[in-house]
Amino acid sequence: MNMQEVYEYLSTVLPEGHVKQDEMLKNHTHIKVGGKADVFVAPTNYDEIQEVIKYANKYNIPVTFLGNGSNVIIKDGGIRGITVSLIHITGVTVTGTTIVAQCGAAIIDVSRIALDHNLTGLEFACGIPGSVGGALYMNAGAYGGEISFVLTEAVVMTGDGELRTLTKEAFEFGYRKSVFANNHYIILEARFELEEGVYEEIKAKMDDLTFKRESKQPLEYPSCGSVFKRPPNNFAGKLIQESGLQGKRIGGVEVSLKHAGFMVNVDNGTAQDYIDLIHFVQKTVEEKFGVKLEREVRIIGEDKE
C-alpha cells in the first residue's frame, strides 16, 4: 500500500493536523532520538483508533503504538507503516475511591488528581514520567510501589479493534513486565482502586519522593529513566558505578555522572549511540561481575540504512 494513499485516507478519518507524513519521532520521545514515521496519527477517541486498526488490517499495514515515549528508544531508521500516538486520549474520572484513567493520561497527573481527592495509593507514581498505558504495559513502579498494587481492571482493544475488559489477574504482572509485551492488545483505560487518606499526609509523602527523585536523577538532560531492570539482590546503577562506567560516552550519549542507572543525551545523540552504549555497559558489567543486565527500556523501529 502506498503511504501517500494511507495518509490521504486517514486524513479523512482524523481531525485536521492529527495525521502527518514523515514525522520525526525524536519529537515524540523523552530521549530525543528516532527517525521518521511513514504515517503518524494522533487519534482523539476510541472510535478513531478502531478506524485506524480496521484500515491497517484490511491492507496489511503494520501499526505501532506509542504513549508519551518516556521508556522507549526508536531506532534512527524510524518506523514503517502507521505509528499511532495515544497522547490525546487523556480522560480521567473520579468516583468515590475509584479513578478511571485513559491510556494517554500522564501517570504523574493521575497521582496529583488522587491527591486532590484525598486518595492514597498512587504516591509512588508522582515522579514516573510515563503514560497510564505505558505504566500498565511495564508494571511501572518506584519507591516500593507498583501499578499492579492499585489496578483492578482495564479496558483494552484487540488487534481486530474489539473492546474487552480484563481483570488484574489477566495482566500476569511481574517485575517491570505484563502480558502486553506478548500480545497485540492496546491498553485504553485503567481502573484504580485507592483508599481515603489525609491530604497533608499524602502531599508530604509525594513531596518527599519528588525531592529524592530530583536530588538523585539527572533530570536536566533527556533520558529514558532507568535503562536496566534491577538484577536479583542487587542494583543496576551500583554495578555500573562499580564498573567505573559513569561518564562513559559513545557519540552524544553518556552514562550519567549523577545516577549510573541512567543514560543521558548530552550532545545530539542518536538511537544507535544509546544502543551501542547499552551493549557496552552490559558487556562490561557481565565481564566484571558475571551479571547480565536486562534492559527495561524498549527498543523499536528500523536501523538506519
UniProtKB/Swiss-Prot annotation:
Pfam family of the protein (one): FAD_binding_4
Biological process annotations from GO: cell division; cell wall organization; peptidoglycan biosynthetic process; regulation of cell shape
Chief subcellular location: cytoplasm
Chemical reaction(s) catalysed: UDP-N-acetyl-alpha-D-muramate + NADP(+) = UDP-N-acetyl-3-O-(1-carboxyvinyl)-alpha-D-glucosamine + NADPH + H(+)
Record-listed E.C. numbers: 1.3.1.98
Compartments, as annotated in UniProt: Cytoplasm
Active site: 176, 226 (proton donor), 296
SUPFAM superfamilies linked: FAD-binding/transporter-associated domain-like (SSF56176), Uridine diphospho-N-Acetylenolpyruvylglucosamine reductase, MurB, C-terminal domain (SSF56194)
InterPro entries according to UniProt: FAD-bd_PCMH, FAD-bd_PCMH-like_sf, FAD-bd_PCMH_sub1, FAD-bd_PCMH_sub2, MurB, MurB_C, MurB_C_sf, Oxid_FAD_bind_N
Pathway: Cell wall biogenesis; peptidoglycan biosynthesis
Protein family according to the UniProt entry: Belongs to the MurB family.
Function: Cell wall formation.
Name the record gives this protein: UDP-N-acetylenolpyruvoylglucosamine reductase 2
Lineage, opening ranks: Bacteria, Bacillati, Bacillota, Bacilli, Bacillales
